[in-house]
Every structure is written in structure tokens, then in C-alpha cells.
Amino acid sequence: MKVPFVNFMISSFPAAVLVGAVVGFMIGRKYSVADASRGYSSKNANKASNPEKESPVSVSNDEDSESETELLDMLKGNSSLAALALAEGQTKMVLVVRTDLGMTKGKIAAQCAHAALACYKIASAVDPDLVRIWENAGQAKITLQAQTEETLELLQAQAMSLGLCARVIHDAGRTQIASGSATVLGIGPGPVSVINEVTGSLKLF
């Protein structure tokens, strides 16, 4: 009885080896495919979370080669006062005080406040971008002096010809001076270079 059993085992051994090999191959292939799938998904997830790592881009600095002088010349010829002020980075408002009236310091302060407010309201309506640039730059205000009413009127006309806001304040005449007297000229806000074309020769007050 033992001999047939031995013969059976011997004859069945090659088949068992073959079956084991096939099963092992299929199991190994299954885990290989699963690992590959997980690796591919992880790679895609990394690409999605870090898109900049996939294709780095180099930026050229050739566009920065244009000189500031050329830019300013272009703006002066073709652009608004706001664009010029933004390019220069300097803006101001000037208050030209008439000195021949003998106004007190308090009176002068009040008249300068009237001029500054008047210019601010007009400029805000006409060129709000320019006003915002001036505000963001610190709202510079400079007080200058002139001797006569005629000088104030001349400066006003010159400023307006350059596109600047210019307003002469006339006093109501309730306190120190005659009614209707021109007291202060406000100019701006505007680019420093443009305002200096009008008031560059005046002395500080």
C-alpha cells in the first residue's frame, strides 16, 4: 500500500511546484502593481501641491534696463500729473502768503488753512489719483511769501497753465484787513518739479 502512495507523491510533485510558482508569481505581480499605483498617485499629489517644482521659470531682468531719465521724459510728454508724481516720488502743496497786509500769525494760519482746504477739495474732484499719491507720501505743505496781490494772481495763472490746481483766498474783512483782500495762494498738490517751475524763485515764509 505504501508503494502506490509514494509513486503518487512523486508523480504529483512537479504539478505542485508548478502551481506554487504560478500562485507566487500572481501574488508578486499584484503587490507590484499596487505599489506602482500608490507611487504614481503620490507623485501626482506632490506635483499638485508643489507646482513650482515641476517646471522652474527663470525671469529676465532686461525690462529693468530702461533708465529713469527716459521714463521721466516720456511721462512729461504724454502722461498726467499723477503719473509724473508717481514716477518722481515727490509731491507737495505750496501756500504763498501775501506779506504786505501785516496779518498776524493767527490770521495767516487761518488763511493758509482756507487755501489748503480749497485746493484739496478741487484737486480731489479733478485728479483724485494725484491727491492719493500726495496723501500717501506724507501730504507735504510748504509756505512761501510774496509781496503783492499782483504776484499772487500771476503765480496762479502760471500754475493753472501747467495743469496745477491754484486758488487765491480772499478775506471776508471781518477782522484785520479790508473785505475782498487776497491773502494766500494755494497751489497743488502736484509733482515737486512742476510746482517748482512756478514757485521755485520764492522765499520761504
UniProtKB/Swiss-Prot annotation:
Its EC number is 3.1.1.29. Residues 40-68 are annotated as: Disordered. The natural substrate for this enzyme may be peptidyl-tRNAs which drop off the ribosome during protein synthesis. Residues 40-49 have a biased composition (Polar residues). NCBIfam families: arch_pth2 (TIGR00283). SUPFAM superfamilies: Peptidyl-tRNA hydrolase II. PANTHER family: PEPTIDYL-TRNA HYDROLASE 2 (PTHR12649), PEPTIDYL-TRNA HYDROLASE 2, MITOCHONDRIAL (PTHR12649:SF11). The modification Phosphoserine is found at S65, S79. It catalyses: an N-acyl-L-alpha-aminoacyl-tRNA + H2O = an N-acyl-L-amino acid + a tRNA + H(+). InterPro entries: Pep_tRNA_hydro_II_dom_sf, PTH2. One of its GO terms (cellular component) is mitochondrial matrix. GO terms for biological process: mitochondrial translation. GO terms for molecular function: peptidyl-tRNA hydrolase activity. This is Probable peptidyl-tRNA hydrolase 2. Keywords: Hydrolase, Phosphoprotein. It comes from the Eukaryota. Signal peptide: none annotated. Transmembrane segments: none annotated. Gene3D superfamilies: Bit1 (3.40.1490.10). Belongs to the PTH2 family. The keyword Cell membrane does not apply. Disulfide bonds: none annotated.
